[in-house]
Swiss-Prot record:
Protein name as annotated: Putative protein adenylyltransferase MJ1379
Record note on cofactor: Binds 2 Mg(2+) ions.
Gene Ontology molecular-function annotations: ATP binding; metal ion binding; nucleotidyltransferase activity
This protein's record includes keyword Nucleotidyltransferase: yes
UniProt binding sites for Mg(2+) 2: 43, 45
UniProt keyword Nucleotide-binding, yes or no: yes
Span of the annotated motif GSX(10)DXD motif: 31-45
Chemical reaction(s) catalysed: L-tyrosyl-[protein] + ATP = O-(5'-adenylyl)-L-tyrosyl-[protein] + diphosphate; O-(5'-adenylyl)-L-tyrosyl-[protein] + ATP = O-[5'-(adenylyl-(5'->3')-adenylyl)]-L-tyrosyl-[protein] + diphosphate
The organism's taxonomic lineage, starting at the top: Archaea, Methanobacteriati, Methanobacteriota, Methanomada group, Methanococci
CDD domains assigned: NT_KNTase_like (cd05403)
General function of this protein: Probable antitoxin component of a putative type VII toxin-antitoxin (TA) system. Neutralizes cognate toxic MJ1380 by di-AMPylation.
Signal peptide (from-to): none
Self-association state and partner proteins as the record states: Probably forms a complex with cognate toxin MJ1380.
Amino acid sequence: MKTLSEIKEILRKHKKILKDKYKVKSIALFGSYARGEQTEESDIDIMVEFDENNYPSFSEYLELIEYLEKILGLKVDLITKKSIHNPYVKKSIEEDLIYV
């Protein structure tokens, strides 16, 4: 099982590709890994923000998920910052966020 530090380091090493190829403006972890409550079965919850003028297509978004799963070796649940509409869900996620 990967540690939070290992995951952050992997994401940092791939930051240029994430920005240049996948148009990621910012990336943050939340959920069980961010809270230190992960188990062997845990996936990793990631929130990304894209540049307003350079939003990826749906297929590019799916490619990003596949890329993250490949480099992390974990199942990834990916959301965008703009996709959180429920204020209670947003608050809960924001409490966990660890930006990379």
